[in-house]
């Protein structure tokens, strides 16, 4: 396995929101605002991070689609927390801020045996290694 990137969870706010004036947002600040949650069942990273600090967010909506959340935040229906890879290219009409005390996730690629891997698989891994950092920056 090779870790390619650490993806950061970020606060997603409408431009006119009171928290937009801050450079970073704490979990405590997030918990006090109407929140739009990506419904990931029991595996929600943001919910685990909040629970670890004994915080309970004001969940207004549970949504199954990342891009629906972005549209809802743009319309001022609440705030959310999403990973940077999801937000890449969709920042217009939103204010994005780092969240203090929030875990990152590893984006990785795994394989069993390089020596027995097909040439196409090896080329794919090489392509990902070379191009993922460029895609993330753009």
Identify what each model region corresponds to:
Residues 1-9, 13-35:
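Flexible hinge/capping segments at coil-to-helix
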Residues 26, 45, 67-68:
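Short acidic active-site motifs
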Residues 33-53, 117-122, 135:
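Secondary-structure junction motif
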Residues 37, 56-65:
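Short beta-strand-to-loop elements that line the ligand-binding cleft
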Residues 78-83:
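Paired acidic/hydrophobic, glycine-rich loop segments that form the ligand-binding mouth/hinge
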Residues 95-137:
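A late-sequence structural motif
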